[in-house]
Design a protein with these regions (language model features):
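Feature captures hydrophobic
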Residues: 1-126
Length: 126
């Protein structure tokens, strides 16, 4: 459980760093307003805010996020979020029932685009 919580906290820091050091990422988030959360079925999670070109997060869940990613448990969440081939891991998790998505799917796709900025320079997103 601690690894999952730490990974969600670290995700915030990685997104903040990408916004600060990558002008294309900064432009991607500059006018975006989004609230989402990543959690387990048991209720452990973190909610994230993207507003005014900034990314922030807090431990715990909120009532009405624009979308939610729910993992079966913390171990599955950690394994999927930290997988080298995240796209395949996400698709497999959805297929296997280890991950469910709810809320605004347009915002989920936008967030997927944001995570592309976390990839090392020169790594293909396709």
């Amino acid at each position: 459980m601690l690894k999952f919580k730490f990974l969600l906290w670290a995700l915030t820091k990685l997104l903040q760093r990408a916004v600060k050091h990558n002008p294309a990422c900064a432009k991607y988030v500059e006018r975006k307003e989004l609230v989402f959360q990543i959690q387990t079925l048991g209720g452990t999670g973190r909610h994230f805010h993207i507003r005014n070109g900034r990314v922030t997060s807090k431990a715990g869940l909120i009532r009405n996020p624009q979308f939610t990613m729910t993992f079966r448990d913390a171990a599955k969440g950690f394994a999927i979020l930290s997988a080298k081939d995240s796209k395949d891991a996400f698709l497999a998790a959805l297929h296997d029932g280890d991950l469910s998505l709810s809320g605004n799917f347009v915002e989920i796709m936008w967030f997927q685009g944001l995570t592309d900025y976390l990839k090392p320079a020169g790594q293909s997103t396709a």
